[in-house]
Every structure is written in structure tokens, then in C-alpha cells.
């Protein structure tokens, strides 16, 4: 199979779909891999690195989209990329379609086969291709939040860990999943007062066992979320409904109740955000103010650490990619319901329920297509 790796063109996105090691794994199996010129440069991978692993360097994205049977990316196709997608071409990347109707309609029109990293499951119902970037984003959320709390960033002028004789900052993490757990790793390491809010008592017990008294586990149904939000210094939104738009847990009124200079980091912004006042931002202009509360809503947080992110992502995405290349998408998806869960758009049809519900578009059961 001919596999294409175009350069990411989303603003401030520096990751690349495949590392040289991943390409070596494909070329050893006699697959042809086309990499756009300097596509991996910002992630620390040179053209020479890719050539040594058997890739061919291609000058333009147009040529890659024209020749490749399968396109591997990191972020969702931008609209000028959508125009290059061919009928029957496989697109393998993060899509986050539930909050992107124009993109979804464009992919439907292209009649391509779109497999979303974020909805592929495993036997336990987890999201193994989303997990590595959720882990990175969770860790970055505290790093970004700590910086935004500084006075010259319009924050409260607080250090998360306080100082001798000075209280630590209150950190509230919404969601105890991969994002929340990894945010807690960094927040507790910085000695913040860390609250993790989740609806699952079992999950909170697991986190309490992991972190001990370093966190305050909080059941969402048994707490006054408005009070908790009003008293926090840093709020991290890490709530996820797989493949669907994130629930708006924090209202505009709650934001108004927060202290001047408090910080919101909405990691769920890729799926629309879990805070009513959140709008997507970029690494170039990451923050804005609403009611004197600093909002950090970068939609591709892991793109800021592209080398770490690309290597972590490839460890998760490569096994399915090799199967797709070796035996084609029909056999691969038909034989494995967890892989089939990744199919979001198939030749003009929406095949993921969360996307169809969020965008009010017709749904077709993917299991009946092959």
C-alpha cells in the first residue's frame, strides 16, 4: 500500500503522523511511504532520517494526496486538505468531528474512509489511541495553568505550590480519566491543593489509592460544583464523552463567581469544551479573559511538545496502521469491532453515533456496511 504523510498545517501544530521508526516498520513490509519535504523538522526528524528508513521525500502535499492510498496525519484535515482528499482514500488521524460540522460535511462529500484515533477502543472500552495525547495534554494543562497564574499573564500572581508559610493554590480537575490523572500527577508534584471531580465513585477510589492524601476525591453528584469552582485558583476541564461533544459542566455564572486572575484550562476544547465561556485558541495566542478569569483553550496542546507527542502517539497508532496497510480496511475493520469503532465517516455516511447525534446528521451502522 502507498502511505502518505503530509506536513501538518494547523496553526502552531508541529507534530508529524509517523516517526522514522514507524516508517521503517512499514517499508520492511514492502509498503511505500511518501513524506512531505521537511514535515518532521519541527519534531526533530530530518528528511535524511526518513530517507534512511526507506521513505520517499515528496515536495508538495498535492502530490502526496494524489498518490497515497492511505493518509496518516495527527490533526483533523484542514479545509484546503479536504479538497485534496480522493474518493476511497483512507484518512487515519484525530478527527474530533462532533464539534466540526463543516469539516464533517466536507469529508462526507469526499467519499473517503475516515478512521478517528479518538474513537478506536480496546477490550475494556478504553480509548488507547487517544490516551497518549490525553496524558500529554493533562500534564501540560498544569504547566500551562501555572504559567497563566503569573501576574504578567494577567493571573492571580500565585505559585501553585505556595512557599514556606504560604498556602498552596487550589487546583480543581474536572474528570478523573487519563487527562485528569495526568494533570494530578503534575499538580500534586507541584504541591497544589488538588481536587479531582468525577461521577464514578470507583474511579475516585482508584485515584485515591494512587495519590493518597495528595488529592481530595470529589463525587460530582455529591458536591456543590459552583462553590468548588468559585474557590479554586486553577480549573482544569478534562471531561470526555467518546466521540461526542463535551458536556458544558461549568456555566457562565460559575465563571463570574471565580476570583479575579483565576485560570481555566479547558483540555476538552477539541470536543467543544466543558466550560461555557471556552473558545478555541492557539499556541500563538493561547489565552483570553472573560470576567477577569484567564482562559487557556489551545485546541492542540500536545503540538507544543511535538517530539514527545509524536513518539508517544506512534506507539499507539502503529499496530492498526500496519493492519490497514497489510490487509486493507475492509478486512481489518470487519474482523475487529474495536477498530471498527474508529470509523467515523464512510463514503459519505456518518458511522459514529456520537458524531451524528452532536451534528444532527443521519447515522449508518458501520457493522452493516461490510
List the predicted regions and their residue ranges:
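Phosphate/diphosphate ligand-binding glycine-rich loop within oxidoreductases
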Residues: 70-148
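Short glycine-/small-residue-rich Rossmann-like dinucleotide-binding loops
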Residues: 69, 75-76, 95-96, 221, ...
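N-terminal beta-loop-helix "entrance" segment that forms/cooperates
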Residues: 34-57
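A short helix->loop->beta-strand "cap" motif at the edges of active sites that frequently abuts
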Residues: 31, 86-90, 109-112, 259-262, ...
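An anion/phosphate-binding loop that grips the pyrophosphate of nucleotide cofactors and donors
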Residues: 67-68, 232
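Adenosine-phosphate binding glycine-rich loop
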Residues: 118-159, 168, 269, 274-370
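Glycine-rich phosphate/diphosphate-binding loop of Rossmann-like nucleotide-binding domains
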Residues: 6-7, 11-42, 152-240, 287
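Rossmann-like adenosine-cofactor binding region
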Residues: 209-291
Amino acid at each position: 500500500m502507498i502511505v502518505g504523510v503530509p506536513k501538518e498545517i494547523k496553526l502552531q501544530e508541529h507534530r508529524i503522523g509517523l516517526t522514522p521508526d514507524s516508517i521503517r516498520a512499514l517499508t520492511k513490509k514492502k509498503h511505500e511511504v511518501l513524506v512531505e519535504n521537511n514535515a518532521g523538522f519541527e519534531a526533530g526528524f530530518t528528511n535524511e532520517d526518513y530517507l534512511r528508513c526507506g521513505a520517499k521525500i515528496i515536495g508538495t502535499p498535492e502530490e502526496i494526496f494524489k498518490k497515497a492510498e492511505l493518509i496518516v496525519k495527527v490533526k483533523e484535515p484542514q479545509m484546503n486538505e479536504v479538497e485534496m482528499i480522493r474518493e476511497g482514500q483512507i484518512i487515519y488521524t484525530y478527527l474530533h468531528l462532533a464539534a466540526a460540522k463543516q469539516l464533517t460535511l466536507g469529508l462526507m462529500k469526499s467519499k473517503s474512509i475516515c478512521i478517528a484515533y479518538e474513537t478506536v477502543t480496546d477490550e475494556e472500552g478504553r480509548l488507547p489511541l487517544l490516551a497518549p495525547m490525553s496524558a500529554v495534554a493533562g500534564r501540560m494543562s498544569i504547566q500551562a495553568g501555572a504559567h497563566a497564574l503569573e501576574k504578567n499573564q494577567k493571573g492571580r500572581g500565585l505559585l501553585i505550590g505556595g512557599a514556606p508559610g504560604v498556602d498552596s493554590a487550589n487546583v480543581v480537575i474536572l474528570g478523573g480519566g487519563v487527562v485528569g490523572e495526568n494533570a494530578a500527577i503534575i499538580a500534586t508534584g507541584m504541591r497544589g491543593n488538588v481536587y479531582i471531580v468525577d461521577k464514578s465513585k470507583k474511579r475516585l477510589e482508584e485515584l485515591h489509592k494512587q495519590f493518597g492524601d495528595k488529592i481530595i476525591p470529589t463525587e460530582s453528584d455529591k458536591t456543590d460544583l459552583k462553590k468548588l469552582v468559585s474557590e479554586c485558583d486553577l480549573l482544569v476541564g478534562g471531561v470526555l464523552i467518546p466521540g461526542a461533544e463535551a458536556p458544558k459542566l461549568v456555566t457562565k455564572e460559575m465563571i463570574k463567581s471565580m476570583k479575579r486572575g483565576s485560570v481555566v484550562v479547558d483540555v476538552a476544547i477539541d470536543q467543544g469544551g466543558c466550560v461555557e465561556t471556552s473558545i478555541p485558541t492557539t499556541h500563538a495566542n493561547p489565552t483570553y479573559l472573560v470576567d477577569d478569569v484567564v482562559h487557556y483553550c489551545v485546541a492542540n496542546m500536545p503540538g507544543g511538545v511535538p517530539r514527545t507527542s509524536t513518539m508517544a502517539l506512534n506507539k499507539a497508532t502503529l499496530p492498526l496502521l500496519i493492519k490497514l496497510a497489510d490487509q486493507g480496511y475492509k478486512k481489518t475493520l470487519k474482523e475487529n469491532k474495536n477498530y471498527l469503532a474508529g470509523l467515523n465517516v464512510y463514503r459519505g455516511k456518518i458511522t459514529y453515533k456520537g458524531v451524528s447525534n452532536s451534528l444532527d446528521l443521519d447515522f449508518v451502522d458501520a457493522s452493516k456496511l461490510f
